[in-house]
């Protein structure tokens, strides 16, 4: 049986780059594994692997907009559904994840 989940709000890599440049207070949570983070990451992002979200929930600032990201945008969408289920708001999924960032914003970034 399929659960009735609405798709989370999403943002493109280029839109996220503009948001970062605007100096609006946001938080970026990267839910990829540590070894993926070591390959490449967005400067200033917080790395909390998906399997550690529950025990690391206190590291997420709930009062500001949080962009959740992963490699391509699937894990981050699942994390957003969990965070919404426990009452978190102002969550945005990075469409295409770090791959989109490397392709559309920072072409010098390593990819995998």
Locate predicted features.
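Short, surface-exposed ligand- or partner-binding patches at beta-edge/loop junctions that are enriched
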Residues: 69
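Rhodanese-like catalytic fold shared by cysteine-dependent sulfurtransferases
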Residues: 1-27, 34-65, 74-112
């Amino acid at each position: 049986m399929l659960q009735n989940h609405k798709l989370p709000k999403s943002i493109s890599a280029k839109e996220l780059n503009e948001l970062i440049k605007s100096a609006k207070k946001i938080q970026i949570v990267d839910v990829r594994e540590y070894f993926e983070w070591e390959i490449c990451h967005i400067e200033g992002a917080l790395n909390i692997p998906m399997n550690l979200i529950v025990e690391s929930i206190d590291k997420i600032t709930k009062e500001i907009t949080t962009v959740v990201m992963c490699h391509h945008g699937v894990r981050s969408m699942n994390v957003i559904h969990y965070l919404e289920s426990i009452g978190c708001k102002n969550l945005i999924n990075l469409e295409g994840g770090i791959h989109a960032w490397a392709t559309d914003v920072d072409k010098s970034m390593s990819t995998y």
